[in-house]
Amino acid sequence: MKLSISCICKISLSIVATLLLLSQVFNTRFLQDDYIVLGFLSESTWIGWLNAVWLGQGGNLWPYGFHALLLTSSVHTVNTSLVAIWTLFVVAVVTLCNLTIFKWVLGEDIKMLGKLKIMTIFSISYLGFEGLFTPGLISAYSYHLASFSHLWPITLLIFALYQMSIGSRNIFLAFVLGIFIGNSNIAESTTAIICFAIMFILRKKDFFFTKEFYEKSKNFYYAVFSGTIIGFTIIIISPGFWNRAENSVGLPSSASEFVRRFFRSFSSFFADLITHPMFWLSFLIGVLISKPIKSFNDRANLINKIKLLLSLGLILFCSLTIGSTFAYVSWHQSTGLYQIFIPFSFLLGFYSESLFNLKSSKSMKKIILFMVITSLLLLSLRATLAFEKRKTDWDNAFKTNVCLVKNDPKSKLLGAEMLYPGFNLGIEDVSSWEWMRDGYAKWISNPEFISEFKC
């Protein structure tokens, strides 16, 4: 039986994504913020950790709290099982989020994804984060504190909007979603508040479905909006938020410094987005599985839905840019953007014939298929080798570091970094940052820590 180009594309995506995910899960090792949490928990309690975060870091307690819970089973031994399993759970949540987006935008056309619908969405959801210059799969699925702070709030916001669109009346769910969205990170919380505020201001106008969202589920809307504001307020009233704002990087001291930092933030996020390979590959994947629109009304409805996604992405982009202007820019802060722009790009490709009059011949689709598969194989091969190398480096460094700390607690430790070429962005380790080293040393030097290695 001869397979169609669309079917070959879906099968290839599924195989590459599954193998790469297994590699990431089986090569899971602790990284960056994990060390300071493990070090703290080896000497104190989970409640003590939340108190320390409140006083010194900020009021976004649920990301730090959940992250610490993931590590509680690893305080006295090297046990990455729960962290690895959580990676699978996050992949499932992101896949469900994208299924929600596609179900809302595509409607009946979601059947066009065929029998491999779930696997196709899973593949796009998982592979969508891997960058050209940054290990995006790590930031989304293994760097759990970053994921809780930047990816989860946008995922939950999309889920909340979908619940409103179908007229959900579950007030408790709405309020809890709002708390989690608002108490995540300033930029993402601000994005949600702006979206809900626009919805209220335009509640009587059908501007990007504001009237539809509001009228179908008013009580849900008020509950999720209230929860978001409460969660956001908890962040900014904490002593740690202002302590970090003043002492970490510091607020801009002049107009010229503000402008310089603003353009640095803008250029960083913009460059990250346009050089992100899956932003373009998702469009091409959509072209390979494309479907024309039959009626003018369907086209107008589709355009409004895609504009809504774009508007959400632009609001988040602006929030991230302004937020990092007052703080700092880091490579792992873009995960929320990918959660919006990767499905957005796929949808543009899926309806490219109707939206842009882009008609691809069979021979052209074969070329596109070759480009997509080749690009994904190269990206996946690099990521797999990077996962394997970091695991090996981490294990070897751990054996050495246990003995180094026993002999001299202040000795220089070996690290296991995962930096992508170009700008040397990625996972740094105990050999580069003193705060990571201190947490790591406290963790492995704890008298109750169990190590199989003899020095």
Predicted regions and their residues:
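Intrinsically disordered, polar/acidic, low-complexity terminal segments
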Residues: 4-62, 71-118, 365, 369-455
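Alpha-helical transmembrane segments
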Residues: 7-21, 121-126, 176, 223-229
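Transmembrane catalytic cores of multi-pass membrane glycosyltransferases
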Residues: 20-85, 89, 144, 186-318, ...
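Transmembrane alpha-helical segments
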Residues: 90-105, 153-165, 193-201, 285-289, ...
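Membrane-interface micro-motifs in multi-pass membrane enzymes
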Residues: 114-165, 316-351
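Signature aromatic-anchored transmembrane alpha helix within multi-pass, membrane-resident enzymes
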Residues: 170-174, 225, 299-310, 353-382
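Membrane-interface alpha helices of multi-pass inner-membrane proteins
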Residues: 171-195
